[in-house]
């Protein structure tokens, strides 16, 4: 077997200002290395703007068929203090230009998505100024993507280990594991679309206390499904707003409830890094503070509950009610719960069979998502 060697990617670092860009452009145009010149001028390019803010970094990742024109467009927005481009006036700002002779539109979008996903998981990066990602249907071998990406990352790491830590360190991080930016399996994607459809329907009919139950064993990808669907609602809202579309059936009035302090930290970091906190304030809560803060008279639109088997069914600590799920349902139009039946063990979370059965009997079984390992036996059911 002949093993095809994937060519080395081009990774060029340029100071992020118009003069440095002009010099770089001149170098490219005058270069005797035809392949280098051709790759940067005639193939799509992935690029990263990064700058320091206090002790941390912020980044913007993009891809373009014309890197020089695209960068000038970004620079034209620098005077506006409300735009991320305003930060590029900082002398610490850098631009990385990334090219490869095999880049096509679909691959550069995948590389861009993976860079956004990785950089969002890096501890020293406090903000990734990108909108939603759009996973591609692949028109090339996935192994080639992994190979080219690893080479790009290695070169970026050579330049700055704080911004570009080891790939393995990223994949082990709690933020990466809970990130809404994972590429979903077909089953997860179906489940996500179905949940969103039900949310839109409930908002359209101005319903209250709608319950969507997502069941599955531990390790079936419910966490990623949960965070991805939660984030998607914000993305849809932003897109409709930016396109001046009717916002009646879109919502940014969404909350994520989690039970552990570590999870609160992780999801708050995700909300900060993706700019949700800046735009919408606190979107992540523990159940009791959420119940105490929001009133029955003014319900929020959507609440997602991760690990709903941990909700209390009796008063304990600062919780004075009898059933947290009941109390959440009274305060929201739609509640999406991720439920792990095998894990209902301790007494204060003791979901008596009757309570559980009562919920389920009010619910028509809607759909089983996939029989395979990823989301084996996730049932989506609604009241």
Per-segment meaning from a language model:
Residues 253-303:
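Inter-Walker segment of RecA-like/P-loop motor cores
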Residues 1-69, 73:
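GIY-YIG nuclease catalytic motif and its immediate N-terminal context
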Residues 185, 192, 196-205, 215-220, ...:
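Conserved helicase motor core of SF1/SF2 NTP-dependent helicases
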Residues 74, 78-88, 237-252:
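Flexible phosphate/Mg2+-sensing switch loops adjacent to catalytic phosphate-binding sites
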Residues 109-112, 121-216:
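ATP-dependent helicase/translocase motor core
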Residues 36, 67-113:
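Conserved short loop/helix modules at catalytic or binding sites
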Residues 46, 209-213, 253-255, 302:
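Residue-level preference for the first positions of well-ordered beta-strands
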Residues 89-95, 112, 250-252, 332-334, ...:
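Short glycine-/polar-rich loops that comprise or flank the Walker A/P-loop
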């Amino acid at each position: 077997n002949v093993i095809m060697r994937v060519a080395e990617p081009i990774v060029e670092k340029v100071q992020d200002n118009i003069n440095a860009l002009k010099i770089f452009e001149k170098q490219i145009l005058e270069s005797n290395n035809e392949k280098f010149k051709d790759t940067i001028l005639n193939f799509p390019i992935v690029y990263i703007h990064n700058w320091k803010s206090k002790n941390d970094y912020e980044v913007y990742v993009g891809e373009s068929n014309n890197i020089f024109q695209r960068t000038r467009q970004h620079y034209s927005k620098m005077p506006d203090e409300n735009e991320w481009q305003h930060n590029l006036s900082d002398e610490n700002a850098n631009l990385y230009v990334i090219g490869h002779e095999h880049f096509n539109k679909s691959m550069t979008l995948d590389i861009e998505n993976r860079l956004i996903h990785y950089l969002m998981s890096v501890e020293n990066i406090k903000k990734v100024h990108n909108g939603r990602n759009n996973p591609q249907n692949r028109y090339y071998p996935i192994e080639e993507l992994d190979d080219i990406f690893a080479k790009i990352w290695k070169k970026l790491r050579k330049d700055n280990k704080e911004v570009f830590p080891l790939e393995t360190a990223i994949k082990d991080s709690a933020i990466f594991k809970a990130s809404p930016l994972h590429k979903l399996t077909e089953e997860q994607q179906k489940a996500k679309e179905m949940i969103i459809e039900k949310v839109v329907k409930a908002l359209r009919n101005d319903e209250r206390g709608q319950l969507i139950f997502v069941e599955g064993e531990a390790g079936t990808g419910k966490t990623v499904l949960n965070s991805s669907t939660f984030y998607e609602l914000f993305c849809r809202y932003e897109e409709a707003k930016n396109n001046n579309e009717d916002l009646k059936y879109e919502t940014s009035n969404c909350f994520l409830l989690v039970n552990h302090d570590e999870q609160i930290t992780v999801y708050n970091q995700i909300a900060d890094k993706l700019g949700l906190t800046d735009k919408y304030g606190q979107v992540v809560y523990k159940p009791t503070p959420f119940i105490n803060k929001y009133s029955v008279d003014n319900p929020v639109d959507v609440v997602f509950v991760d690990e709903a088997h941990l909700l209390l069914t009796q008063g304990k600590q600062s919780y004075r009610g009898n059933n947290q799920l009941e109390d959440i349902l009274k305060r929201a139009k739609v509640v999406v719960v991720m439920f792990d039946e095998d894990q209902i063990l301790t007494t204060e979370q003791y979901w008596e069979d009757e309570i559980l059965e009562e919920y389920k009997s009010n619910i028509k079984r809607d759909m089983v998502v996939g029989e395979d390992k990823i989301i084996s036996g996730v049932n989506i059911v609604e009241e």
